[in-house]
Structure formats: C-alpha cells, structure tokens
C-alpha cells in the first residue's frame, strides 16, 4: 500500500477526497437541510439559528491547531489519528440526528446537533490542512491546493443539490443515512494509507513513529506557543500574516454588497442571482482554483496573485465609474463570473504561499492562524461596506478596487530566505 509521503497520487487523492468530505456537510446543512425546514414551515428565527450554529464551529479552528500539533498517536502518523477520529465523528453525529423525534418541531435539538457535527467538520478541516502542509512537496503545492479547493466545491454541490434531491424524493432521515454512509466510506482512505512507511496502520498493528528531517516533537502547549512565536519572528511569515488579512478584506466586501447591488440596484430577481452566483459562479470558482494551482507551480505565486488582484481591481473600477457598463446585462454577468474566477485563482496561489512558510513543528497552528486572519478580514470587509452605504455604489466599488491591490505591498517583500516564493 502506498504512503502519503512516498506517492504523489496517494497524497493528492487523499487530500482532495478529504476536502470533498468537508464540503458535503456544509452544502447539506446550508442548502438542503435549511431549504427542507423552510418548506415545512420553519420561520426565519429557526433557520437563522441553525445556520449560525453551523457556522460557529469554524471559528474554533484557531483552537484546534495547537491541540493537533501537541497531542496525537505519533506511531500512527502526525495527522492521521485526528483525521480518522473527526471523520468517524462526522458520520456518527449525522446518524444520531435520526434519533431526533419530530425533526421539524425539535429545532433546538437539531440546531445543537448541527453545531456538534460541524465541530468535527472544522477539526477535520484543520487536520487535513496540517497534513497537506506536512506531505506536499514545494513544486506541487499550487496544483494540489487548486485540486483540493475545487474538490470542496464539488462536495458542497453533492451535499446541497445531491442530498436535496434525496430529501425531496425519500425524506430527511434517508438523506442523513446516505450522507453518513458516504462520509464513512471516505474514512476508509485515511485508515488504509499511512503517512510514512514504517508507521502503524492501526493502534494494535506493528510500527513506530517516523520523523522527517527537520521535524520536531513539541513537548507541551507552551512549546507550541513558543514555536509559533519563533515562526512569526521571522520576517516572511509575519508579512504573510499581514497579507492573509489584507487579501481577504475585499472578499468580505464583495459577499456583503453583491446580493443587494444586483437585486435592488440593477433589478435582478433573487432567483436569478442565486442561480448565477451559486451555479455558474461555482463552476467559475472551480476552474479558477484548478488554473490558479497549476500556474502557481509554474509561474510562481506572486505572478498569479498579482494577475488575479489586478484583474478584480479592473472589474471593480469599471463597475464603479461607468454607469453604462453597470446597466449592461452582459457586463453584469461577466463581472460576477470574472471576479469569482480571479478571486479563486489568487486564493489558491495564496494557500501555496502560506504552506511554504509554515514551520514543521507548529505547521497546523501556523497555517490555521493564516486562515483565521482571512476569516476575520471577511467580517471586517462587510463592516466597511456598511460604513460606506450612504456614499453610494461608485465609492464602494472604487474602495473595493483599492482594497484588492493593497495586499501586494505585503506580498512582494516576502522573498529573503524563501527562494521558492517566486517573484
């Protein structure tokens, strides 16, 4: 049986399948489950509560990082034990939802079960990211990151559209069972494939811990914190942290402004906007992820990020200054798809950068902090849009155009001691 460090195919397939497994529960809860509950008479308060409790566990990612870096069954690999545990718990919590009596009436119980389920999904996410940092080689990070990101889109589509079809034809409980079964089948991959040759496949089998050159064991949580401080004391990782935050501000602004702008300002229906942004837009995101990952390995992270950011900025300037383009139906569609494609392109290239800058001993925590800063920036971006509401869309789009290129000031100095980050 191949190992993750010994086989590019094994690590690529494993990471992509794990990312699809993360996307499935998200699509299932936010699309299929909430749509079903709404059709059964659930009000906005009930569906909003479930949605909020599904999102909340993703803020715990910054806590999972130090835990998975510190505690593990090292003889089975550094990340596999956590992935196996979280994937198994994801399946178990879905099956537990079947035991809830009247699913449409017991919202409180269902909401907290959704919360618990997504706690394990977020843990699997952090563990998979840390595994990618550990096993991917420098010359494949961009391509594989693109494939992983695209796989998450596929998982979301399966969990949302696929499970939604199951619910419509067979009911909610069969959908719980089917999704739990799929997640359990995915569990077979991390169970059967070792990280490194010579490690234990399972706790009762033969094997021993294997450390890669430069990899260290962290003794305690204090050691993790110390290691993290040491990692960010270096100039490139610190600049990358500033870049991680700045690069996501505009994304948060876009998420906040697009639905209102398209439905209230230029007259799209809610249904049409949802179909374009959620359907064709998702496809554009998949293509952007695959292309961005492929080109980042060949042309360099900075080239791809710069192209993506300048492209988005140009779209925003055009939408802001030209009322004629703003009223043009073709440009309205091109703007949505083009910005989605370019944002996905630069995002995947950025993931490759963050992974290359991670220190092995605290890789899980360090990478998670980069992601946490990006998530925080999206909240900040939405707040910026709210503060600009009275200034009009021209100002908002011009601020978005500036916000998407500003991070380049943090990106370009990242070179000293990091020759793999190509200019």
Regions found by a protein language model. Name each.
Residues 85, 91, 174-192, 395-413:
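Symmetry-related core transmembrane helices of the 12-TM Major Facilitator Superfamily/SLC fold
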Residues 60-77, 167, 287-301, 389:
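Helix-to-loop junctions at the C-terminal end of transmembrane segments
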Residues 302-350:
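C-terminal transmembrane helical hairpin of 12-TM major facilitator-type secondary transporters
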Residues 83-105, 310-327:
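C-terminal ends and interior cores of transmembrane alpha-helices
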Residues 57-61, 142-161, 167, 371-382:
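Glycine-rich segments within core transmembrane alpha-helices of 12-TM secondary carriers
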Residues 1-9, 197-240:
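Juxtamembrane intracellular "pre-TM" segments in multi-pass secondary transporters
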Residues 31-46, 247, 256-274:
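Short amphipathic helix-loop junctions that connect adjacent transmembrane helices
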Residues 33, 122-136, 344-359:
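Intracellular juxtamembrane helix-capping segments at the cytosolic ends
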């Amino acid at each position: 049986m191949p190992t993750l460090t010994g086989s590019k195919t094994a690590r690529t397939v494993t990471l992509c399948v794990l990312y699809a497994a993360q996307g499935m529960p998200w699509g299932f809860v936010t699309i299929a489950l909430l749509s079903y509950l709404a059709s059964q008479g659930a009000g906005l308060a009930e569906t909003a509560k479930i949605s909020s409790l599904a999102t909340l566990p993703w803020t715990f990612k910054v806590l999972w990082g130090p835990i998975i870096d510190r505690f593990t069954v090292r003889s089975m690999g550094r990340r596999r034990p956590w992935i196996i545990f979280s994937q198994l718990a994801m399946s178990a919590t879905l099956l537990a939802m079947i035991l809830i009596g009247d699913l449409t009436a017991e919202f409180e119980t269902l909401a907290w079960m959704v919360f618990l389920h997504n706690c394990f999904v977020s843990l699997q996410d952090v563990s998979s990211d840390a595994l990618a940092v550990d096993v991917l080689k420098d010359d494949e990070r961009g391509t594989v990151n693109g494939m992983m990101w695209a796989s998450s889109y596929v998982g979301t589509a399966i969990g949302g559209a696929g499970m939604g079809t199951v619910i419509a034809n067979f009911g909610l409980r069969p959908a719980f069972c089917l999704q739990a079964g799929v997640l359990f089948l995915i569990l077979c991959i991390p169970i059967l494939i070792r990280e490194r040759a010579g490690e234990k496949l399972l706790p009762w089998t033969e094997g021993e811990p294997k450390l890669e050159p430069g990899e260290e064991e962290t003794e305690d949580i204090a050691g993790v914190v110390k290691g993290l401080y040491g990692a960010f004391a270096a100039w490139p990782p610190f600049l990358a942290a500033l870049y991680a935050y700045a690069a996501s501000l505009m994304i948060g602004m876009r998420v906040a402004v697009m639905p209102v702008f398209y439905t209230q300002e230029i007259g799209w229906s809610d249904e049409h906007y949802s179909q374009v942004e959620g359907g064709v837009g998702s496809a554009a995101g998949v293509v952007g992820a695959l292309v961005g990952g492929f080109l980042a390995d060949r042309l360099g992270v900075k080239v791809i990020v710069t192209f993506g950011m300048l492209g988005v900025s140009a779209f925003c300037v055009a939408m802001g200054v030209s009322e004629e383009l703003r009223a043009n139906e073709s440009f309205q569609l091109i703007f949505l798809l083009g910005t989605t494609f370019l944002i996905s392109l630069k995002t995947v290239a950025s993931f490759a950068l963050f992974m290359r800058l991670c220190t092995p001993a605290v890789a899980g925590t360090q990478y998670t902090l980069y992601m946490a800063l990006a998530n925080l920036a999206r909240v900040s971006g939405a707040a910026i849009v709210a503060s600009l509401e009275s200034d009009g869309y021209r100002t908002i789009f011009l601020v978005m155009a500036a916000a998407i290129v500003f991070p380049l000031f943090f990106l370009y100095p990242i070179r000293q001691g990091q020759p793999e980050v190509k200019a």
